[in-house]
Amino acid sequence: MRLLRTLTIIFSIFTTSVVLAQQNLPVIKANQTKISIKDGDEPVTHYWNHLSTKVKPIVYNVLKSNVSRNLTFYTDIDSISFNVSPGKSYDFKVLLMSKDTCYVKLSTEENSYSKICNNCDSLSDTIQFIFSKSEEITIKGSLNNTGIVDLIFDTGAGYNYFIGNGLNEKFGLKINGLMEDESVTGLATEQTSFPNQLQISSLKWNNQSITYIDEKGYTGGGVIIGYNMFENKVVKIDYDKSLLILSDELPVDISGYTSVPMRHTTGGTYIELTIFNGKKEIKGWFLFDTGASFALSMNADFESKNLIKDGMKKIGTGRIASTESDYQEVDIVLAPKIKLGDIEISDAPINIGGKNMFQLKYAGIVGISILKQLNTIVDYKNQRMYFKTNNMFGISLKKK
């Protein structure tokens, strides 16, 4: 009885301390559920979960950086700022419409996975993928233990997505939130589900948020996993061997690779690329996006400012789409040459898109038609990327 009494007292003290901690959290106000965040020197971003009382707390996973910086969380009528550091979380409350309390957590903690295997203390983890006919990095995995499902690794995505039509219950997705999702065509309000479990081979991720897009025509369902899954790792994409290799450090041998500076931001991962239009060279920062089905796309404002089309041949028009029903018309021009580090690629088609296609601070997107020709090492923590030509290098970038 003494042991039971002692445990009861300890539990009571713990519960009381948790309640007091929640009571002492800072409070801001909101009249609307949409929010914005300014993370360090980056522009204010709007692609975040809506405030809700259904999920406690609502976790906002901000940039996983090794740099401390100031971060401000905005509602429509109020704001709160924190000096954030790597591997930390910051809690507060939002009083919504003067009556509902939303519990909020800003997190710079890494999205780590666990290993469900014996003697798996290796320095790296290897994932086999299939490079599909539609040029997608496709991995076999599972969602909420509901059976095998295709997972597409999209380096341009910062979140996980499920795309299907009326399939949320089949795959164990509990729809309990909304978010503003940003794609090449702008912002759209989508449904979200939390928590979820994803598994690839012996690697398991718990407490994952998934954005659910109920798209007509997608009867089988599929998952898109973003860079958020591997943000704490060095990621090697080997198209020759169809392997993803995850490690904590750069490989010992990176001979033959060219090093390229990168910017990993709240809006994505960007690499510096040089375009030669026949008259001059222009440098810009492009989103590193294995989920984009083209070679290059460019923000219309960046093109206009640098007169990039001047001297380049228009070879057609096209569409850039985030879904079958959500797209933008674009002009397609041909760049005589582009450079990525020491690697030169000839006759690269560029889609010239609209103003709202990307964060205006950046030039555009480099897609899979170029990236598939280059084995890649992404060092997220140290902001460097490494490229090496592979067996697909030299394939024409022009669509047949």
Language-model features, listed with the residues they occupy:
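Bacterial Sec-dependent N-terminal signal peptides
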Residues: 1-26
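Pepsin/retropepsin-fold aspartyl endopeptidases
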Residues: 20-400
